[in-house]
A protein has these predicted regions:
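Extended, charged catalytic domains and RNA/DNA-binding interfaces, predominantly
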Residues: 1-209
Length: 210
């Protein structure tokens, strides 16, 4: 089976119509999660970088749109396209974090509410015992600027896999093919997959479009 569990559209600040995203996935994949950007609990840390202050309004405006009817539209369309046995859809949404790195909460239930948090660790606590995966992605960016911090990794059912590859590039290490192409910076060894493995962590690996 092939799918994409981290796929964006313009419901927040991705590109392309949401229905087009589902239609394209249905033509080629077995399952998908079209994933809104939903929150950034430590966004005020951007104030330490004057050149990045514009980013705050850009993101918070999108989060407001999601909470002013956007999430209900997203949830309804996710249910509409779910066709068990042929094509599965999943509710998922993304939280950014300067400290912890970006994560997606992927829900088994198609009735999942939008759950906020004060930090990624707080998010993980809220989802304990539920059928929710909390997975880090674009892990190779610089720690402190939305790259992953392996000291917060918890091995187990809640985070059975991490995202090694996406349109951002390859997070296997800080060298090698497909460098990071986004304006959030080059790859950083301490956030990479190989670094996590060298710490003795055990996890599965996935790739998504993001």
């Amino acid at each position: 089976y092939w799918g994409d569990l981290h796929n964006h559209c313009n419901i927040t600040y991705g590109h392309g119509d949401m229905r087009d995203a589902f239609e394209a996935a249905k033509e080629q994949l077995d399952f998908v999660s079209v994933t809104p950007h939903a929150m950034w609990p430590d966004i005020n840390l951007l104030n330490r970088e004057p050149r990045l202050k514009w980013v705050i309004g850009y993101h918070t405006d999108a989060f407001k749109r999601l909470r002013q009817g956007g999430y209900e539209k997203y949830s309804a369309m996710t249910k509409e396209y779910d066709n068990p046995g042929k094509f599965l859809t999943f509710i998922g949404y993304e939280a950014h974090s300067m400290v912890y790195g970006d994560h997606v909460a992927l829900h088994k239930s198609l009735d999942a509410p939008l759950v906020g948090c004060s930090s990624i660790e707080n998010w993980k606590d809220k989802f304990k015992g539920q059928d929710v995966f909390v997975t880090p992605h674009h892990m190779g960016y610089q720690e402190g600027f939305r790259g992953y911090n392996w000291k917060y990794f918890t091995e187990g059912d809640q985070t059975p896999f991490v995202e090694m590859y996406s349109r951002h590039g390859l997070a296997e290490g800080d060298m090698g093919d497909y460098p990071y192409l986004h304006d959030m910076g080059p790859r950083n060894w301490e956030g990479s997959i190989l670094y996590g493995l060298k710490q003795g962590h055990k996890f599965g690996i996935m790739g998504s479009t993001d």
